[in-house]
Each structure stands twice: as C-alpha cells, then as structure tokens.
Amino acid sequence: MASTYSFDIVSDFDRQELVNAVDQARREIKQRYDLKDTQTEIELEEGSLTITTANDMALNSIRDLLLTKAAKRGLSLKIFDFQPPESAGGNRVRQVVHLKKGIDATLAKQIAKQIRDNFKKVQPAIQGDLVRVSGKDKDELQAVIQMLRQQDYPVALQFVNYR
C-alpha cells in the first residue's frame, strides 16, 4: 500500500521574534544621539505597529533601524506593510505598519495553479489561509518546495507539517 505525503504552505511569522526586534529597536533609539530627544514611541498591537516620532527624518531612521533588527532576528521583511506617514499633531509624525499574516484567496489560487501546471503528480488544496500539497513521491514534494522558493511572492512563505 502506497502512502501519501504532504506539507502545508503558510505565511506566518514568529511573534516573539517580532517583540524582541521591537524591544531592541526601542533600546537603540534611547541610546542613539540623533534619536535620543525625539520622544519616539513604537507601539506593538495584535496586527500592526505604530511608530510616532518628531519628524520625517527620524521616522526614516527608525524604519531602517526596525527593518535591520527584524532581519537580524530572522524575520522576513515582507511581513511589514508600511502605510503612508500622517501628522499626529504637535509637529509629530505617525506611521502605521500592518503585519501581513496568512495567504489570501487570490494568491492561494495562483500558487495552486502554478503547482498544478508544473507538477502533475501532486495535488494542491486550498484550506483557508494555507495551501496543502500532497503526493505519493517525497522527491516531487521537495521539487515543489524548491520551485516555490525561487518565485517572488508578496508574502513570506513557510513550508510546515511535512509528513
């Protein structure tokens, strides 16, 4: 009896690593001479970050600092969706950063179609915000993973539950 193997394609990030990256950025903001007196706040909510600071120059520096800390913690930079900066009153600037999580339906359909077109022996199935790929040959599944890693998608893809 031949068994089937499968894996899931998801778009997720490690929340604790994000918390650590934000904490490191806050600490460095307090230490850096050019950012010390800007009264910068980085607030981490469930699905977004809010950066509030004195001016656009400080905002750009903080954005670069946050991205650097996130990359060093192993987070993909594709999870950050920077919204346009807005005035926060009192000569301050605020920028909201949405955190991308999950694969939307159109991208899931695109991934499933690409797998179906290139690999006839595996079956992709869309299940909510993940795509499950199953097949009888482990090597085919490995080839699917390699093909998807070479593509450039607007979200960071992870491959989990490989059985």
Curated annotation (Swiss-Prot):
Entry keyword set: Nucleotide-binding
GO cellular component, one term: cytosol
MF terms (GO), sorted A to Z: nucleotide binding
Family matches, as SUPFAM superfamilies: YajQ-like
Residues of the signal peptide: none
InterPro entries listed in its UniProt record: DUF520, UPF0234-like_C, UPF0234_N, YajQ-like_sf
Keyword Calcium: no
Organism superkingdom: Bacteria
Gene3D superfamilies: 3.30.70.860, YajQ-like, domain 2
Entry-linked Pfam families: DUF520
Function, in words: Nucleotide-binding protein.
Family per similarity comment: Belongs to the YajQ family.
HAMAP family: YajQ
Protein name: Nucleotide-binding protein CYB_0891
